[in-house]
Amino acid sequence: MSILEWFWNILCGMAQYLTFSKNLTNDNLVNIYVKSNVGGTISVNLDPKSDIKNVKELVAPKLGLEPDDVKIIFAGKELLDSTVIEVLDFFSDILHAVKVNKKIKNVIPDKPLCETLEELHQLNDQKNVESIEESNLKNEGKNKAHFFIYCANPCKKINTGKLRVCCSECKHGAFTVDTDPQSWADVLDKNKITGVCNNVGCEGLYAKFYFKCASHPSQGENDTAVPLNLIKRNHKKIPCLACTDICDPVLVFSCDNRHVTCLECFKNYCGSRLKDRQFLSHPDFGYTLPCPAGCSNSFIEEVHHFRLLTDAQYEQYHRFATEEFILQAGGVLCPQPGCGQGILIDQNCNRVQCSCGYVFCGKCLEGFHLGECLNPTDVPFLSQNCDYPLDPEKLEKARWDEASSTVIKVLTKPCPKCRTSTERAGGCMHMICTRANCGFHWCWVCQGPWERDCMASHWFG
């Protein structure tokens, strides 16, 4: 794409966005953008009751052609002259005008994609075949979107979406499909549906399907959204597996049983698993969850479904996913309270220093120490030298709350030799362990033996 074409697309997108609120004029005319396959975009005003034949009559003279020499393409279909504008799944989108090439076999005009998908949906339902879902609910005639998407910009939420088609090679919208998609696999997988690209100089053979948000005016051909293929209209009236209510829409898991849950119960399910940190790290799908019934082959592949969580929960989900990735890669998380930064470590080096300044052992995640790591029950307590021994497990249960242990970890560091917690109350960084039979000299900063380098660099911090 040249700089001029890129700049033109930006201007078209801005014009569409700024003028959409004025699309309905005093004469009830709708402003429509028609893009030619030889470059340039034409703006025409039409009555919503107008048909494609009227579009050709307005557009053809501006292209120097006769109406019969022009075909109009929208969402992978060459439209019939009798197709009425208002029945299209159209929301400030772009129609494509292409000169008819009489030397080659042209595609037979067809119904718009939104109508043919309705017919396919009913047929596939009878055959019990997975199909692209659409809504048969009443009072939804004006909303032709049959999909759910996550709109990252500007809506930043889950909305209904609309299916669009372009050439997989040049990404131009003047592409007609040979057959309609029969399943989600046809839409999501590459090179499933063949067709003809009408863009000059392109010989692309495969369709690329993508989705746009139906809740805001199109911001250009590059305005896309993430499809949420598990969220569907509940036209079958299936009850939720948790609350047994019949809700719409619902989420249908990919397990063999195709378990159904309402969106509210799905949010509760994800929230409880997130709180207990029970999401699983899948090698192909990332940090995700399976069907709550424990079915095999039921992991959620598109993680944007978790956008149903609150912003705070989704931020926590992202943090946990990042931490899990680091742990799976052999890294560690800084044990310093209030930090938790992920660190990829050298497996041959036990001494790890976080950017927060905390130095710890890469194996046991305790403060850095010399010698072998000790089991938690082997860590010495100062109280063991008196007549009042404390059991670590019972001591853990006897806490008022976790605040005291957090303060201790922040204000103290363990002796690198014997692990006795030591608090620094000012002064220099030269520490001497006070535990009997230890007396190890060490550096508060690097948590290693007190040496000349420490004297030079760390004496006062």
UniProtKB/Swiss-Prot annotation:
InterPro entries: BRcat_RBR_parkin, E3_UB_ligase_RBR, IBR_dom, Parkin, Parkin-like_IBR, Parkin_Znf-RING, Rcat_RBR_parkin, RING-HC_RBR_parkin. Pathway: Protein modification; protein ubiquitination. GO terms for molecular function: ubiquitin-protein transferase activity; zinc ion binding. The modification Phosphothreonine is found at residue 176. The active site is at 428. Coiled coil: none annotated. Zn(2+) 2 binds at residues 167, 170, 197, 202. Zn(2+) 1 binds at residues 151, 155, 213, 216. The keyword Zinc applies. Residues 236-461 are annotated as: TRIAD supradomain. Its main location: mitochondrion. One of its GO terms (cellular component) is mitochondrion. This is E3 ubiquitin-protein ligase parkin.
